[in-house]
Amino acid sequence: MLRLNDVVLKDVVSYHSFFSKQAPGVKGPTIEKFLKRFEYNAPLDLYQVVDLEDFNLFFLDFFFKIFPKNLSIFDRQAANIVTANIIWSYRSWRHFKGLPCRGQRTWSNASSCYRSNLILRDYKKKNVRKIFGKYGGPEQKICFLCEYINYLWKSQWFSEWMHSRKWIKYTLKKKKVVFYLDLYATSKGLLGNLRSDAKGVTKKKKKMLTGHVGFDQGFTKIYLKAKYAVSKKVRRKLSLR
């Protein structure tokens, strides 16, 4: 047995058995593409578990993270974006990140990079429409950026995110208070100011953050619901703030 990432992989004696048991949907052509992209000359089944202590576990760890652990459609969707971006066009992924590939310049292989970006753009559009509905292109982009910035603050600056969340709840409890949320400014990272009595917040972040973050996931969908639930005549008079 092989233990990786605090998970015991049962009956895994080689990379080949790992593919057949832990990576559903991976067949021979996919394995050959990996071997070609990462320039592995030896077959995967030659690396046994007993030799993995001396062998670099990066390759196996890479597969274990990107492939889903079951046949759930949500895990499969999460893996599709990785397979489309790395497996199908590893060179394009390197060029997109501004990194050289096999000694080439970053400006080369433009056609494959263009095709890869088209596939990724269509994939993102489909996912955004599933989350936010059939909104226009600009609204989709704004919603996606607002959700991303809100999640970024929650994951990296949780104390500031919680302070903004408490400030929002405190403001909404007041009577005759209209809470304005500027989605355009939030999508550009212009988040305003915190209260001067904020504790545990640096001066730099006080100038960047107010009640524009601190929301639950999907807050933009609820915020835009009123805009797209009215008639066309009234909709023309409304605008995102």
Swiss-Prot record:
Primary localization class, coarse: mitochondrion
Protein localization: Mitochondrion
GO process annotations (BP): translation
Record-level GO cellular component terms: mitochondrion; ribonucleoprotein complex; ribosome
Keywords attached to this entry: Mitochondrion, Ribonucleoprotein, Ribosomal protein
SUPFAM superfamilies: S13-like H2TH domain
An MF annotation (GO) of this entry: structural constituent of ribosome
InterPro entries, alphabetized: Rbsml_uS13_C (IPR027437), Ribosomal_uS13-like_H2TH (IPR010979), Ribosomal_uS13_CS (IPR018269)
Family in the record: Belongs to the universal ribosomal protein uS13 family.
The protein's name: Small ribosomal subunit protein uS13m
